[in-house]
Amino acid sequence: SLNTTVSFPNSPAFNASTERWTIADPPTYIAAIRPGTEEDIGKVINLARTKRFPFLTRGAGHGYSASLGAFQHGLSLDLSQWKTLKIDKKAQTLTVGPGVTFAEIFDPLFKAGFYIQTGSCSCPSMIGVTIGGGIGRLMGKYGLLMDALQSVRMVGAGGKVMRVSATSHPDLWWGILGAGANFGVITSATYKVHPLVNNGNVFIADFYLPVERSREYFDIVEANYSNMSANLAQIMVASWNRTTSSVQLGGNWVYYGPEKEARKELAPVFNLNATSSTRIVRWSEIISSAGFDEFICQPNQPRSLFSLNQKIYSADGYQAGFEKIEKYFYDHPGGRDTTLVFENFPNQAVAAIPDASTAFPWRDFKGFIQINFAWTAGDDATAQASNKLGKELRNQFATTSGYSEKAIFVNYAHGDESIENIYGRRKLPRLAQLKKKYDPSNLFAYNHPLP
């Protein structure tokens, strides 16, 4: 179509169509195409299948799996300009295109009187996050982001446009809900949204503790919040404080309800008498008010992530990991933009959905551990130390995660894990059958690929 454009290396258009959040383990491209229509996407897919050249779909450029490094000298299928956003107030639905990021839904949805469960930073593609599951602070109330999904339009490996839902291609729908990157190019997605509660206001409390009080804080979390309210969520971050030249622990709590209820829920934390701040913000401002989104969302940075699901909160495990990251900060000053993140999220609504109903394998988790390594481009020594420590910490945290083997959320996976650890042993046979049926040529083979 006239709206489809092709670009080549060393041009501004090409750079825009291949920009990534992380420059670690990069895929490489010989050309980029911005398709103007679903039909043109189908033509690209058909050419890729018949001519046997690789392509990689791009929404917001936030994919960071090391497995993407296996993609070399291919085509970027850039959908970042597909920014359709439609709210149907009567049906209480939101429809978005693959280029729409979380940042772009907050204000329109809030102004329309709705909200939805989202991720914890603003820059990824909403659809990209969804098809791996989509976790976040509201999953105790409303489930995973994919649990809000009602239907998608997708160009499949055969080049044809399909509407996929619980009643249209239900077998493929099952696979999209947890392993969606393996089956086609999603061009739009429709979600169920919820009317705002508490006038759309949420209570936020931030706590900051010096290194010597880390264990005390971890004990409070394990003892009081292992079965937290569905309205409550916390993200803990261990980071280097450049002002004090030491490690600090921060806890960002969000409560979806009145301040009085929030303060009652958080009484054990307030009783620590730690440095703290509180505020009431609109739902649409939660991420921007947390203070780390702008830094996290900077593109074109060397980053490497290692992660693990947690079924239990272990103060012993948290403290052991905290001490290792503290040593890393002192031994490797070039890595002091690194963060160790513990996401403590309730899972009532996630666990209420039958495990067999979707491909997603981890409905029993209550949170996630992430080590987000960051260093300066060219600092190979810090990069190597980060990779080594990331694997060590992942193995160490696995012993106190509550799982019998490593369980890793696909959107957080590093890319070196076994597919059993990512997709779950019991889900893989059915996923493998779906892959053979819907993508027999294995065109979608780079982002945590199925066998």
From Swiss-Prot:
Single GO molecular function: FAD binding
Cofactor(s) named in the record: FAD
Keyword hit for Flavoprotein: yes
Keyword Thylakoid: no
Positions of the FAD-binding PCMH-type domain: 22-196
EC number: 1.-.-.-
Gene3D superfamilies assigned: 3.30.465.10, 3.40.462.20
Domain of life, source organism: Eukaryota
Pathway field: Secondary metabolite biosynthesis
SUPFAM superfamilies per UniProt: FAD-binding/transporter-associated domain-like
Key words, A-Z: FAD, Flavoprotein, Oxidoreductase
EC top class, as a word: oxidoreductase
One Pfam family cited in the UniProt record for this chain: FAD_binding_4
Family in the record: Belongs to the oxygen-dependent FAD-linked oxidoreductase family.
Function as written in the Swiss-Prot or TrEMBL entry: FAD-linked oxidoreductase; part of the gene cluster that mediates the biosynthesis of virensols and trichoxide, fungal natural products that contain or are derived from a salicylaldehyde core. The pathway begins with the synthesis of the reduced chain in virensol C by the highly reducing polyketide synthase virA via condensation of one acetate and 8 malonate units. VirA has interesting programming rules since the first 2 ketides are fully reduced, the 3 following ketides undergo beta-dehydration, and the last 3 ketides are only reduced to beta-hydroxys to yield the trihydroxy portion.
Entry protein name: FAD-linked oxidoreductase virF
